[in-house]
Design a protein with these regions (language model features):
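An alpha-helical, amphipathic repeat domain used for nucleic-acid recognition
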Residues: 1-177
Length: 177
């Protein structure tokens, strides 16, 4: 096919340089680096050797990655606990590590306040009390909150402040728990 080419296979030294380039571009988990290196490696053993070397030099640390990623997604993007956990798992962070990082990041967080802030940001310049009287808009707001990683209970508690029909949302299937 035109436009697609097979990447050049690299030896251990080439993989080392490639891994530094990858990590220089953005933070990656060990699983992500392993996957990217495996595509370019001549030998599978070279991948593990490069990953071990990256860890020895302190360039690759899933604990630090998970901690910073979880706090970034919470503080700067306003996502809820479940969304951050799902994203960490998609980024190939070990489940126990991801759970611990998310628990630490959300330790002293009031989810209701987070939901309020999320709604205020997503529905800027809109009267939520008026908008959410419409069933479709209420359901849409609920789905947005669930997709953003907020629990059903916190989402409904906040939405009740704007629309009495929010109690009926509990019967809907959850977006992703």
């Amino acid at each position: 096919m035109r436009g697609q080419r097979t990447p050049k296979k690299l030896d251990a030294d080439g993989l080392w340089g490639y891994s530094l380039k990858l990590l220089g571009g953005r933070a990656l988990s060990t699983g992500e680096v392993r996957q990217k290196l495996a595509r370019r490696a001549e030998k599978d053993t070279d991948v593990e050797a490069v990953i071990a070397k990256l860890r020895d030099y302190g360039y690759l640390n899933d604990n630090k990655f998970a901690e910073s990623y979880a706090s970034w997604r919470k503080e700067n993007e306003g996502f809820g606990k479940m969304r951050v956990l799902r994203d960490l798992r998609q980024r190939r962070v070990a489940p126990t590590l991801a759970d611990e990082a998310v628990e630490r990041a959300f330790k002293d967080t009031d989810e209701t306040e987070q939901v309020q802030a999320f709604l205020a940001r997503k529905f800027r310049n809109v009267d939520l009390g008026e908008l959410l009287q419409e069933d479709k808009k209420l359901q849409s707001a609920y789905r947005k909150l669930r997709y953003a990683g907020f629990s059903s209970g916190a989402s409904i508690r906040v939405l009740k402040g704007y629309a009495e029909k929010a109690d009926q949302l509990e019967d809907e299937p959850a977006a992703d728990e």
